[in-house]
Structure formats: C-alpha cells, structure tokens
Amino acid sequence: MIASCLCYLLLPATRLFRALSDAFFTCRKNVLLANSSSPQVEGDFAMAPRGPEQEECEGLLQQWREEGLSQVLSTASEGPLIDKGLAQSSLALLMDNPGEENAASEDRWSSRQLSDLRAAENLDEPFPEMLGEEPLLEVEGVEGSMWAAIPMQSEPQYADCAALPVGALATEQWEEDPAVLAWSIAPEPVPQEEASIWPFEGLGQLQPPAVEIPYHEILWREWEDFSTQPDAQGLKAGDGPQFQFTLMSYNILAQDLMQQSSELYLHCHPDILNWNYRFVNLMQEFQHWDPDILCLQEVQEDHYWEQLEPSLRMMGFTCFYKRRTGCKTDGCAVCYKPTRFRLLCASPVEYFRPGLELLNRDNVGLVLLLQPLVPEGLGQVSVAPLCVANTHILYNPRRGDVKLAQMAILLAEVDKVARLSDGSHCPIILCGDLNSVPDSPLYNFIRDGELQYHGMPAWKVSGQEDFSHQLYQRKLQAPLWPSSLGITDCCQYVTSCHPKRSERRKYGRDFLLRFRFCSIACQRPVGLVLMEGVTDTKPERPAGWAESVLEEDASELEPAFSRTVGTIQHCLHLTSVYTHFLPQRGRPEVTTMPLGLGMTVDYIFFSAESCENGNRTDHRLYRDGTLKLLGRLSLLSEEILWAANGLPNPFCSSDHLCLLASFGMEVTAP
C-alpha cells in the first residue's frame, strides 16, 4: 500500500522537478544566447553528430530560432561581439546545475561554443547591418533598359536545411551567377520611355540588342543607275540631249495622326517621336537628296505653314498645299524648284462628294502642270510639259470600292490637266501613298489600265488584309459610281472626252423642213411685192401636216456616254519605278511597317508603256517614251528594318521610307 502511494506520488513529483529544472536551464541558456552576436553557433551545432543527447539540444535550438533570432540580429548590428568573460561566466552557471541529467553533453556544447566565440573575434569581415536589406545589383544590359539581380529574402530561411555561417552567406550573396544577375528582371516596373520591346501581336516581346545599333550602316540605300541600261527596244535611257530632274515622294507622318495611333509606336523612344527632333531629321534628308520636285503626304497644316514651308522656301522650293477636307489637320504638298520648272496650272482634288455614300471620305490629291526650263546652253529647244500628281488614298482595307472611286477621280483630273490639243497626253508622274500592295487589283488597274471589278470583294481591292473568313462581305456592283459624278468608266470627265459645243445652235435640214408649212409661213407678209409666178401664190399645207412644230429635245443635243458593265479603264499608260522585289536578297521591297509587318504602299508611277519580254531579265519591262527613268534609290527589306528597330527610328523619322527617282525628258527642236 505504502509502495503504491509512493509510486503514485513520487513519480509525478520527480517528473515535475525535472520539468522545472529543464525550464530553468532553458531560461539561462536563452539569456546567454540573447547576449551573443555570432551565428556561428548555429552553423557548428547544425553540423554536430546526432545522438540521444542531441535531440533535446536541437529542440532548444529550434526554440531559439523562433524566439530570439530578431534579437540576435539587432544585438549584432548594435555592437561588437561579446567578450569572453561574459561567455565563460554564463557557461559556468549552466555547468553548476546539479539537476541536469545530460550535463556531460552540455559541457561539450559549452566548450564548442566558447571556442567559436574566441574564433569570432578574429573575423576580418564585419557582420552586415541587415541581412534582408542588401542593395540590388543593377546590371545595365542595353541603353534605356535596367536589369537588376534577384533581391535577397527579407529574413533568412532555415527550415529543413542546414544553417550556414554568416561569412559563407555573405560570400555566396556576392558571388551570384552572372547569367542570373543579367536576366533577372527587377521588381520595379520599367518606365515606358525606357522600354525597348516590340509588343506586336503574335510576335511576343523581343529583347533589344545588347549593342548600339549602327543605323547608318543598316539603313544604307544604294543608288541604282539605269542611264546605261537598255530598255525593251534596245535604246539607252541616257542617249541624246535630255532635261534631267529628280523627284521624291515621302509620307512624313503627321504628328496628330501619330498621337492618335500611339499604340503603333510603342517600340520607339519618346524622344525620337518628338516633332522638333523629327523635323530636323526630315530637313536633313531633304537637303541630302536635294530633289527638284518634292511630293509629301501627311503634312500637318500648322507644321507646314510655321516650319516646313519657310524652310523649304529657303532651300529654293515653291510649295503648294492641300489640306484634307472636314476637320482633318493634314494634307498633301507638292514643291518644285522655280529654277528648274515654271508652273502652268495647279489643280487641287477633293474626293469628298456631298450626298454620295461612296465618296464621303476626306482624302485629297494635288495635280500640277509644270514646264521644264531648258538651260540656255542647249539653244533653241523645247521640252514637253510635265504633269505631277500627288495623293494619299483612304487606308481602310475593307473599302476597296472607295479606293477605286477616289483613284478614278484623280485619274480624270490628271487626264484633263495632261491632255494636249491633239488629244494625246504630256508625260505624267503619279505618286503618293496609295494604301495598296503590289499586284493588288488597284495596283494592276493603275499599271494595266483596266480592271474587271464586278462581284469582287471590297477587301480584295487593296490586298492589305485577308477578310475572306468573314461571312458577310461587301462586293463591288456595277456601276461602281453614279453617272451624276460626271466621270466615265474610262476615268475621264464627260466634258473632257466630248468636244465642246459652240454657243450658236446648229440645225439639220430635216429639222428646218418642219417649218415649211407652219402657220407663220402660210401668211403673206405685209408689203410683199406681187411678182407673177413668184409671190402670187399662197402655200398650201399638205393634208395631215401638223400646224405646230415640236421643239427639238434638249437631251438629244447633249452627248450621252455609255457605261460598261463591271469594267473601268484609263489610257494614261503608267508603270512603276520600282519592281517591288530585291533580287540580291530574295525578299520583297518594303516602304512601311505597320504593326511590324513590312509592305509596300508608296509608289511612283510614270508614263511608259509596259511590255512583255519573256524570260529576258536584262531589259526593263517597258518602253521609254518622252519620259525616261534614269535611276532610283533602292528600298529595303523587312529584315533590315527589323534590325534597325523598325520605323520610325533615330535615323529615319517617319514610319515610311522615302522614294526617290531620276528622270530624263527628250529635248526637241521647236
């Protein structure tokens, strides 16, 4: 009985005493560790061999990690390591505890900690102030792009891993892999002006090149000389005396339009999109190529009158400008040097026609008739006039019907201005941004002079995009434009294709015979002398003769024009200066890159009859007339423009490339 009582009473008391002694030991040890500054204890203790006594030490260490880590770090940052006397006295208090069963293991642990504290005094590297606030390592990859190293954790993570000494942790921190440092994105968002990526749909984000782009080398354009190359007839373009001149066509990108479609220019640095920067670049480009005729599109009105026109006037140009109708702020301009040409007439063209749904857009054109000025050294010679047309056609890829109608109006105006007294045409140059790709129906219509459009999907006219997947497509119907427009299906004004009527009306014999027995003709005039056999008889009206004479229908006097069914034509015989293909690279030519997709939409057409030459590639595919192509500035491929970060860029300040060609006109004796 007594033994049972002792068993039930003494055993819990023993366990309680042991728990109190453990708590006292833990408290003493926490005080010591709280005043310690070296986490080397953690590293050595973590690497100690495991044993029965080690399990309790590991539990105490885990509690120290959870409760006293922040205090250890703060204490370490405030002062130097603790002195050895304090460490030895603290260890002595722990060693004098008679109730601790694992005193031997504690003795070994204390000895190791004391040696570690002595070794910590000889450390050369100071303890970092805050492990979690190390500065980010910034790596400059490309100009304008900032890349930073991976940020360190705010608190060291010790769970489920062996602890490392502070020295090892600091060393590993500064010896990070360079590849990781170079390609780890900083958590801070990169400003838009420092971004240098191409967010084009379907192309992902392209990293900018790591070196500075040599724009002058990448965008170098060769001059192609045709003056010694024979044409289809075997004649060289440079034979005989000629009046030579150069013409440039350039869409210079209106600032207002750029700001309205800013999503198209996210790949550009904001500085190169500034108008003042772009204006200087454009003027330098004009001065470098020094054309005799300059045809510009997307010319903003205020920039034209305030900067462009005065600057071009100082360069020796005379300029004509036509702003787009409606509330649009840009337009077209044609400039020429008065030392080379004399103006005969200028005709602005508006495509907007009130009341016609087909022609409700604000695009415009400009047609000039220029007389070349022959140098005095050539003597008494003459040169035919030159007709120059500049336009910017509607962009909308789905409205090919509008594009064709606008082009028909421009061709009718060119036909009227360029028509000579004998019915032929003087040399013609038609240029501008036509918003159509090569070999599209609109392009073929200009080059071939004929197009069968009836039933054609409207999106197919320009070839810019493929909308064949759409169920309901707008198709072209005949006639394409109403007769009230006053333009025939041959793209001529009705008043131009028929001879002008004289103010005096002319009547035929049959019409005049209607008045033979009218009432006034059957009355004897007063005072008429009676002459036998001549005036003595009264005219007798035949039976059934109408007394009243019907007037001739006015519509019969007006010449009527017939409409062809689904076909439009023109007789200007135009061909393109460019072939739209780069044989050296095996790539198509590119004049612009909307949304990162290179295409040709800018053209220079001139008067020259196209012809077929089979497989002969050494001759040009047209016959030279009065106007001869002497040379052109080569275009670039899409890959080259991609290498230059697209358009615009610091070297080219427009989203289009300029087109430049040299021509020669025959000089004849008067």
UniProtKB/Swiss-Prot annotation:
The keyword Membrane does not apply. Keywords: Phosphoprotein. GO terms for molecular function: catalytic activity; eukaryotic initiation factor 4E binding; mRNA 3'-UTR binding; protein domain specific binding. One of its GO terms (cellular component) is endoplasmic reticulum. It holds the Pfam family Exo_endo_phos. InterPro entries: CCR4/nocturin_mRNA_transcr, Endo/exonu/phosph_ase_sf, Endo/exonuclease/phosphatase. It comes from the Eukaryota. The modification Phosphoserine is found at residues 77, 105. Belongs to the CCR4/nocturin family. This is Protein angel homolog 1.
